[in-house]
Amino acid sequence: MTEVKLDFQKQGGLIPAIILDHTSKEVIMLAYLNEEAYQLTRTSGQMWYWSRSRQELWHKGATSGHYQTVKKITADCDQDTLLIEVDQLGAACHTGSKSCFFHIIWDEEDSKTD
């Protein structure tokens, strides 16, 4: 395991985190962590985020029961973005969807002509 120095200052004290379902490898969320949320995530084994809209720490699942248990945390080459694999209990999205990414804007079928 490699110890990295995450760069929280590059983006105003926050690091974006791409959240993957550990089993399916599907992207289920994009959220942000500040240093405190990162430390809470590391020590608790559950996901903690920084809510940009509410300006407060957010323990994923504390209200909904849809907890995320951390399986793996990887930093990108610049050490300013995280890729986090989780076991998702219930829906990841506040809409009740498994993933927050369900609005298909374009796919290869859109570019095919008859």
From Swiss-Prot:
An example molecular function term from Gene Ontology annotations: phosphoribosyl-AMP cyclohydrolase activity
The keyword Cytoplasm belongs to this UniProt entry's keyword annotation: yes
Positions of Zn(2+) binding: 77, 93, 100
Catalyzed chemical reaction(s): 1-(5-phospho-beta-D-ribosyl)-5'-AMP + H2O = 1-(5-phospho-beta-D-ribosyl)-5-[(5-phospho-beta-D-ribosylamino)methylideneamino]imidazole-4-carboxamide
Enzyme class: hydrolase
EC id: 3.5.4.19
GO biological process, any: L-histidine biosynthetic process
Top-rank lineage group of the source organism: Bacteria
Needed co-factor(s): Mg(2+); Zn(2+)
Annotated residues for binding of Mg(2+): 76, 78, 80
Keyword field: Amino-acid biosynthesis, Cytoplasm, Histidine biosynthesis, Hydrolase, Magnesium, Metal-binding, Zinc
Transmembrane segments: none
GO CC, alphabetical: cytoplasm
PANTHER family xrefs: HISTIDINE BIOSYNTHESIS BIFUNCTIONAL PROTEIN, HISTIDINE BIOSYNTHESIS BIFUNCTIONAL PROTEIN HIS7
Assigned protein family: Belongs to the PRA-CH family.
Entry protein name: Phosphoribosyl-AMP cyclohydrolase
Organism: Streptococcus gordonii (strain Challis / ATCC 35105 / BCRC 15272 / CH1 / DL1 / V288)
Organism ancestry: Bacteria, Bacillati, Bacillota, Bacilli, Lactobacillales
Gene name linked to the record: hisI
